[in-house]
Amino acid sequence: MQLNSTEISDLIKQRIESFEVVSEARNEGTIVSVSDGIIRIHGLADVMQGEMIELPGGRYALALNLERDSVGAVVMGPYADLKEGMKVTGTGRILEVPVGPELLGRVVNTLGEPIDGKGPIEAKMTSPVEVIAPGVIDRKSVDQPVQTGYKSVDSMIPIGRGQRELIIGDRQIGKTALAIDAIINQKDSGIFSIYVAIGQKASTIANVVRKLEEHGALQNTIVVVASASESAALQYLAPYAGCAMGEYFRDRGEDALIVYDDLSKQAVAYRQISLLLKRPPGREAFPGDVFYLHSRLLERAARVNEEYVERFTNGEVKGKTGSLTALPIIETQAGDVSAFVPTNVISITDGQIFLQTELFNAGVRPAVDPGISVSRVGGSAQTKIIKKLSGGIRTALAAYRELAAFAQFSSDLDEATKKQLDHGQKVTELMKQKQYAPMSVFDQALTIFAAERGYLDDVELNKVLDFEAALLSYARGQYAELAAEIDKSGAYNDEIEAQLKKLTDDFKATQTW
């Protein structure tokens, strides 16, 4: 087959006309150094703070330092195989995690990927991990309770929906136990829970997940894990990821509770990243913005008003407020609450539950110190019956502690002082509670009623908890309607007071404890 010159030129023209050039603009850079999970990238223009940078092998790094001729980024995952000269690409996106009800009952990592072996999560939505907190106009005052199930907390240091209540104390004195019991107590309350484990041993986290499952609370809970073996970047980001998952419920008129266990380890991870990025260190070698690290996280816990929810859902949800309640945990060293991170978080939160080593070792568990524990807003959210009955509990305990200190120096005490000491001892004994045994509103109200009205005065100290158990068992059997009414409404009036008095008198007459 022979082609003449005209046909050849026509064929070439045809090919040129049909040729399509597909060009793609890529923001590319080159790795110039790798050390301890920090990479420096040259040539990556137009990158923003917190942008995800795609690395070879489907991994990502987070841009944190934007310098004149390079970008400092922290690798989210293993980095041993990264080398100088490798090409990286800017994505133009900031980190987002999957959110929604599909995550309930699952254990995920910081990026929202399942790590519980129960298959993929079919989440329909994602949300940025860094979000600006709701403004002043969008918020509503806290006036609904979060029942933790602990007598000592719900009576003296009440927590409201949308509050930030710090749990602070030394290691191994029950901080996590208190938070986990609070989550277990929400299984029938309509409050969704998020538990964020930061820098903990994998075995400890597995035990927490097992306990939540055993007590039927895992189905309403999302567990976010950044264990001690994870990179510092993932430990630093885990609380923000968990918060984004909680905000999904808050912004749709639901209530959620989030536990950060613990923010001390997050601050240490952030300090590690900052020092490796050569940011100037400050007090205790923490960077200058460690306060902002926690304030921008905890300010996202709030109660938002009906207008905010309606606007956010485009009118789909009307007349409902939403809330995200935060229980951050801080570990102190030898009870030093004046260290840098503890004082920061105390100043950000709406109160603190202080757990004391001396009380824990003395067998008072939960080891809540009522003297320096406080709730700045929860009082207005307290259940009515608990608020009415528990007014004297804190006073009795404070007076008992003060008198007990003086009583050590004096043997001849007057009758009034002896009576006050005896009452204080019994109230302290009554505040003890076993782990994984949260109490209902009725159980707490009846126990406090018995203590406040002097029904424990003739009960021996070592029989106080037996008396309580027998009283509650009797009440649930003989006064089931009253128990159901108080659990449902939390109301208190003269009629309920008379019924509680009759109940306790009837029980005392049986002498069965």
UniProtKB/Swiss-Prot annotation:
It catalyses: ATP + H2O + 4 H(+)(in) = ADP + phosphate + 5 H(+)(out). The keyword Ribosomal protein does not apply. It is a peripheral membrane protein. InterPro entries: ATP_synth_asu-like_sf, ATP_synth_asu_C, ATP_synth_asu_C_sf, ATP_synth_F1_a_nt-bd_dom, ATP_synth_F1_asu, ATPase_a/bsu_AS, ATPase_F1/V1/A1_a/bsu_N, ATPase_F1/V1/A1_a/bsu_N_sf. Keywords: ATP synthesis, ATP-binding, Cell inner membrane, Cell membrane, CF(1), Hydrogen ion transport, Ion transport, Membrane, Nucleotide-binding, Translocase, Transport. Its EC number is 7.1.2.2. Gene3D superfamilies: 2.40.30.20, ATP synthase alpha/beta chain, C-terminal domain, P-loop containing nucleotide triphosphate hydrolases. One of its GO terms (cellular component) is plasma membrane. ATP binds at G169, D170, R171, Q172, I173, G174, K175, T176. Belongs to the ATPase alpha/beta chains family. PANTHER family: ATP SYNTHASE SUBUNIT ALPHA, MITOCHONDRIAL (PTHR48082:SF2). F-type ATPases have 2 components, CF(1) - the catalytic core - and CF(0) - the membrane proton channel. CF(1) has five subunits: alpha(3), beta(3), gamma(1), delta(1), epsilon(1). CF(0) has three main subunits: a(1), b(2) and c(9-12). The alpha and beta chains form an alternating ring which encloses part of the gamma chain. CF(1) is attached to CF(0) by a central stalk formed by the gamma and epsilon chains, while a peripheral stalk is formed by the delta and b chains. This is ATP synthase subunit alpha. It comes from Vibrio alginolyticus.
